[in-house]
Amino acid sequence: MSTAPNAKNNISLKKSVGDVWPLTAKRVLMRVDFNVPMQNGHITNDYRIRAAIPTIRRVIDQGGICILLSHLGRPRGVSMVAGVRDIRRRYHEAQFHDNKGKTAFFSVLPGEEKVKILAKSSAREEATHISPEVKSGKTMLFARLPEDEKKSLLMQYLNENKDSALPQMSVSAGYEEQYSLRPVAVRLAELLGQHVYFAHDCLDARVEVSRLKRGNVMLLENVRFYSEENGENAEEREAMAKILASYGDVYISDAFGAAHRDSATMTGIPKILGHGAAGYLMEKEISYFAKVLGNPPRPLEAIVGGAKVSEKIQLLDNMKQRIDYLLIGGAMAYTFLKAQGYSIGKSKCEESKLEFARSLLKKAEDRKVQVILPIDHVCHTEFKAVDSPLITEDQNIPEGHMALDIGPKTIEKYVQTIGKCKSAIWNGPMGVFEMVPYSKGTFAIAKAMGRGTQKRGLMSIIGGGESAGAAEAARISHVSTGGGASLELLEGKTLPGVAVLDDKE
């Protein structure tokens, strides 16, 4: 079949980090996607961190200063106003121990630190004759300074020595330990083989950023600790973006996984700086999706799985205009099978989507798109792993049983169809692949796509989500790092975080 006239390509090529030069001594704000799985403070899969390394190396090898921004998980987040109040409260508590005052705070500092502070004061000439030793007159000299000067000197000292002087300041406003990016900074340093500086508060990092030298890398704390990152109010998002934009000269986005967000860091910063380029990872994502949604080698098939038809309606509706084959698996397949009159036992079914399923099958037939549904199933009476699950003879599922994976006949048929195609895009697992007895279908698809890619040049794309986890080790052309972003592209939507970047000339 040919692509329908109204099946427009919703993504275009963008200027990349390779087009941005010189980067020497430039402060490069790089939005990355370090939203990695964590368990008990440990990273369980560092794929997204490793995927950003080439772009980071490009910046530092060119003598640039790399300042990384990312989110992690879904923290509650606080407003910037509340965050500023919290920071001021903590500064106040740090400066006035039990209301003893500035001189009392100064008095408990190490002698070397006292000398450094006095060297910046109006009494610096007198201070040159004072040693760091105990009882040499440092505190007495500080006590004679005007109150405003004391405050200014201590504020400067606190800003420059947060970690050591103010342990209570070494966490962000809105901080939630399980969502902190600190473990990511540690892993990134291991992968880069160099120190990675870590700013405890993304909106209070001006001093730390100003100290960075050529070739340095800094990771800012989770941008979602502030609610303005994904806030609905455009002015509030812009206010946050302005602070972050002030840290840098150049904006590069390598966060395809967050490209569907109209957020402070994805769209706000490049709008303020007036430019934006794609990192190598983003460039690769754009390139592959532009091909498969534009003029891919044919035949083109879409393999769609997952739990719910309702979550894939727009994808199915959009892709039917572009593809030659549609293979459906996962729990969503049972809604389509029931719509065709088959028995599905206790399997999941969205009754409200039966009419959509019938309509899609009819439209696909009219467009000469071949829709292939499971012809056998791996079943059990309960949603749990068992050593010997039931394998059905045909499409029908016995009463009292639920299908949890595609069966061996279906696997064979799907693998044969993959063998006919020159392009394939896959989104969603074929079964409950987290349970070993129901993982064969998903991993068989991954293996078939990998084999086709390596042996005959199949252009294969895994469109993010759980299927990406199953296929990472397979030899696929491209495993997308974007779950929601790739899904929205396949639904025919424009990604704000891509659209805002400069077009390739």
Curated annotation (Swiss-Prot):
GO terms for molecular function: ADP binding; ATP binding; metal ion binding; phosphoglycerate kinase activity. It comes from Trypanosoma brucei brucei. Its EC number is 2.7.2.3. AMP binds at A307, K308, K312, A331, A403, E434. Keywords: ATP-binding, Glycolysis, Kinase, Magnesium, Metal-binding, Nucleotide-binding, Transferase. GO terms for biological process: gluconeogenesis; glycolytic process. CDP binds at G306, E311, G330, G428, F433. It is an enzyme of class 2 (transferase). The keyword Kinase applies. HAMAP family: Phosphoglyc_kinase. In T.brucei, three genes code for phosphoglycerate kinase isozymes, which are transported to different cell compartments. Pathway: Carbohydrate degradation; glycolysis; pyruvate from D-glyceraldehyde 3-phosphate: step 2/5. ATP binds at A307, K312, A331, A403, E434, E466, S467. It catalyses: (2R)-3-phosphoglycerate + ATP = (2R)-3-phospho-glyceroyl phosphate + ADP. Monomer. Mg(2+) binds at A307, E311, E466. The keyword Transmembrane helix does not apply. This is Phosphoglycerate kinase A. The lineage of its organism: Eukaryota, Discoba, Euglenozoa, Kinetoplastea, Metakinetoplastina.
